């Protein structure tokens, strides 16, 4: 999270990680928690993270323009109880194109969800 209230900070290296620009705030909410951000095989960027306030939501945002603009595409988990937590997401896309999301579920276990990139755009999982 960034220095402002509930900000995600990000930087991208065009030099294989040898040189980095200054990090910038993304216009996405974040309650000082970890996020996952892979580049999909299509070239789009996907973020899994929590919404504003607490960790009682797990959300997916998608960027079609290398991170300049983001849109909320799916709510994976949501609970009205602020003490419920869905956290520490990890994302990867397997060779077959399926996207795998693993995260801590209610501090009781690890949940694993598998879905297609089309699901992010409103299609079937």
Predicted regions and their residues:
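Asp-box/BNR beta-propeller blade signature and adjacent active/binding-site loops
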Residues: 1-125
């Amino acid at each position: 999270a960034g220095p402002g209230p509930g900000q995600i900070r990000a930087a991208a290296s065009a030099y294989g990680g040898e040189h980095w620009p200054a990090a910038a705030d993304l216009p996405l909410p974040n309650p000082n928690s970890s996020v996952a951000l892979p580049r999909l095989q299509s070239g789009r960027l996907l973020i899994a993270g929590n919404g504003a306030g607490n960790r009682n939501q797990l959300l997916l945002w998608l960027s079609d323009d290398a991170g300049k603009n983001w849109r909320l595409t799916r709510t994976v988990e949501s609970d009205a109880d602020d003490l419920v937590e869905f956290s520490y997401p990890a994302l990867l896309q397997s060779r077959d194109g399926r996207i795998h999301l693993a995260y801590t579920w209610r501090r009781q276990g690890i949940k694993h969800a598998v879905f297609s990139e089309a699901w992010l755009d409103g299609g079937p999982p």
